[in-house]
Design a protein with these regions (language model features):
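Interdomain boundary/hinge segments at the C-termini of tandem beta-sandwich modules
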Residues: 134-137
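C-terminal motif of bacterial Sec signal peptides marking the signal peptidase cleavage site
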Residues: 15-17
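Aromatic sugar-binding surface patches on proteins
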Residues: 90-99
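Short, solvent-exposed loop/linker segments at beta-strand-coil boundaries, enriched for Pro/Gly
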Residues: 57-58, 63-83
Length: 138
């Protein structure tokens, strides 16, 4: 009986996640690739970046203007961050996080969301981002 209840809860959880993904566009970013990812979003639209971290990256950092600290993850962005969710990133294992944003750009220029890993961030005063995501708001 317990197996059936657990299975039912698992199915409900997956349905909930599918519904959420249907409402928000999700863009995948694989960290430590050293390349710029570019995405187009509409003004006012909510979108998500699904960040995949390679083993050895125990947290990731977004380098931009606003600062909001939570657990091991440091978030800095020009965008309104709605919320984030995902697997807690542990040293030496694969992890992922979803960051949900709302495109609130007032200018025509693309916005950059810059990432680096915690090790790079802590070793340097002005860390260079290892990843850049370019967001074009139409």
């Amino acid at each position: 009986m317990t197996k059936y209840i657990l299975f039912f809860l698992f199915v409900l959880l997956n349905l909930y996640n599918c519904e959420k993904e249907d409402k928000v566009k999700i863009y995948d970013v694989i960290l430590n690739q050293g390349k710029t990812n570019e995405f187009n979003v509409k003004k006012g639209e909510e979108f998500a970046l699904r960040l995949f971290c390679s083993p050895g990256t125990n947290s990731l950092i977004l380098l931009n203007k606003k600062e909001n600290q939570d657990s091991l993850t440091y978030i800095k962005s020009d965008y309104e961050i709605v919320h984030y969710e995902g697997e807690e990133l542990g040293l030496g294992r694969m992890g992922y996080l979803y960051y949900y944003f709302k495109a609130t750009s007032e200018t025509e220029e693309p916005k950059l969301i810059k990432f680096t890993d915690a090790y790079t961030y802590l070793q340097k005063e002005n860390p260079t981002p290892t990843e850049i995501v370019k967001i074009n708001v139409n």
